[in-house]
């Protein structure tokens, strides 16, 4: 199950890269969400020895996630910037980053080292990193199947994480589990939005692109 979870952790980045390559467009992708994920993966890479449950992926996977996240950000704001939904991706990341930093300082699990605070910050940030993507979904005129597949893969990863925690409950810690449950709730909101697009496309000014 752990191997499946590792593969599902990489899958969202693969899907986004496939979308960028196949469509030559970053439409429907929140650049601000990708920046937040790049911060998350950067912090997790710093956990060199894998001592944190937040950075428990194999080192090669953490490095791969870091590199692909920065590549995606570069492609969105670089070669494909003309297709970027800038007018809809308007949520200020500062409103998400500051509360996460405060939570990392005051709601950490005992360890007060700088590395522990940074990893706790990454965990809280990972909860809300999808929020700019949800905001963008509410404003764009189309949502393609790549974006839907991206959201599904993220939700599947978190579901596998929780199942793996259930199998190894004695080794679990609270923070990653809270991250997973809250993220899944956010993904449910995203799926409800996409479902509404499909069910009411004659009544709203945007559609789901097949």
Predicted feature residues:
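Alpha-helical membrane-protein topology signature
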Residues: 1-210
